[in-house]
Curated annotation (Swiss-Prot):
Necessary for the introduction of cis unsaturation into fatty acids. Catalyzes the dehydration of (3R)-3-hydroxydecanoyl-ACP to E-(2)-decenoyl-ACP and then its isomerization to Z-(3)-decenoyl-ACP. Can catalyze the dehydratase reaction for beta-hydroxyacyl-ACPs with saturated chain lengths up to 16:0, being most active on intermediate chain length. HAMAP family: FabA. It is found in: Cytoplasm. Homodimer. Coiled coil: none annotated. The active site is at H71. GO terms for biological process: unsaturated fatty acid biosynthetic process. SUPFAM superfamilies: Thioesterase/thiol ester dehydrase-isomerase. It comes from Serratia proteamaculans (strain 568). Its EC number is 4.2.1.59, 5.3.3.14. Pathway: Lipid metabolism; fatty acid biosynthesis. Keywords: Cytoplasm, Fatty acid biosynthesis, Fatty acid metabolism, Isomerase, Lipid biosynthesis, Lipid metabolism, Lyase. This is 3-hydroxydecanoyl-[acyl-carrier-protein] dehydratase. The gene is fabA.
Length: 172
């Protein structure tokens, strides 16, 4: 049984990447540079705009983050796809938090809008995930809407983020 806490530290998230947080069958988060959050500050099973669950996480920004040195030289900006990936990561993390087992795979997104950017001068990125639907049966899948904020301003929105958990990804 997964111990459900309402927040997780960077060390907890790194343990998830090693397969230690949710046990051998639970979905791991990416490790190293691809882990796009420093902490989960809130998780609820019945909160959010649809009362189906809510996750809020944060990433501390500093000019030394790996992507600023290569995207783009002379014009550093966090790639928008990394913010999108962070939202998918959090959907999968939530499914593991609920006790779902398998390897997480992004299955799609309805619509993504970018209305701002993350520059090296920013201090903090916040991710907010509002679940619309969660299926925990033979099929394990989450559908959610998400927002990315930089220093309190919404800069990306995504509707219908979909993540599934798969015990066998060979035929995926």
């Amino acid at each position: 049984m997964v111990e459900k806490r309402d927040s997780y530290t960077k060390e907890d998230l790194e343990a998830s990447g090693r397969g230690e947080l949710f046990g051998a069958g639970g979905p791991p988060l990416p490790a190293g540079n691809m882990l796009m959050m420093d902490r989960v500050v809130k998780m609820t099973e019945d909160g959010g705009t649809h009362n189906k669950g809510y996750v809020e996480a944060e990433l501390d920004i500093n000019p030394d983050l790996w992507f600023f040195g290569c995207h783009f030289i002379g014009d550093p900006v966090m790639p928008g796809c990394l913010g999108l990936d962070a939202m998918w990561q959090l959907v999968g993390f939530y499914l593991g938090w609920l006790g779902g087992e398998g390897k997480g795979r992004a299955l799609g997104v309805g619509e993504v809008k970018f209305t701002g950017q993350v520059l090296p001068t920013a201090k903090k990125v916040t991710y907010r995930i509002n679940f619309k639907r969660v299926i925990i049966r033979k099929l394990i899948m989450g559908v959610a809407d998400g927002e990315v904020l930089v220093d309190g301003q919404v800069i990306y929105t995504a509707s219908d983020l979909k993540v599934g958990l798969f015990k066998d990804t060979a035929a995926f």
